[in-house]
Amino acid sequence: MRKLLIFSSLVVLLGVSSCIKEKQTGADLVVGDVVPDFTAVMSDGSEVTGAQLREGVCCIVFFTTSCPDCRQVLPHMQRLRNEYQPQGVRFAFISRAEGAESIREYWIANGYNIPFSAQTDRDIYELFAASRVPRIYICRDGLIKSIFTDSPTLSYEELAAAIDICIL
């Protein structure tokens, strides 16, 4: 019984850490870097490009619905989008190696209405980062002004304050 408990604990720990630590490949953008070129087709049929996001204020969110930290921050992001999009802030929700069907199911189950780009690979993600989701970039006029990951745990207030600084 003890061996089963230890084995089960290890399996759970490995699963939880999989959204945080992965093999390191890809860019490592920092505050002050320029939003890279990319094109993503969103779930509503629209297209988002790096060039579009280099104009004005934007928030780029990389996520997977299986990641516990992403699940914690997505309600904040829905609220931020509802509040700041009318002020001209653009939002791009881009999955990291997750297909449309599982995202759509998660969105429906949680009442989200955010357009997303389902990326079955890590190509767009790796233009920005090598590891860790959630990963949120708040940018103004093409420059990354703030980067948020899962550590420390993200609050709505922190994210809103970073957007406020960019729109003032």
Question: What spans do the regions from the language model cover?
Answer:
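C-terminal motif of bacterial Sec signal peptides marking the signal peptidase cleavage site
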Residues: 15-18
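Structural microenvironment flanking redox-active thiols in thiol-disulfide oxidoreductases
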Residues: 71-110, 121-126
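Hydrophobic beta-strand anchors of alpha/beta hydrolase catalytic cores
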Residues: 59-60, 91, 136
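Short, internal strand/loop/helix patches
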Residues: 107-141
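Thiol-/selenol-based redox modules, centered on thioredoxin-like
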Residues: 138-168
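Sec-dependent N-terminal signal peptides
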Residues: 4-13
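Short active-site neighborhood of thiol/selenol oxidoreductases, capturing the structured segment around
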Residues: 50-71, 77
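N-terminal "domain-start" segment that seeds a small globular fold
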Residues: 20-50
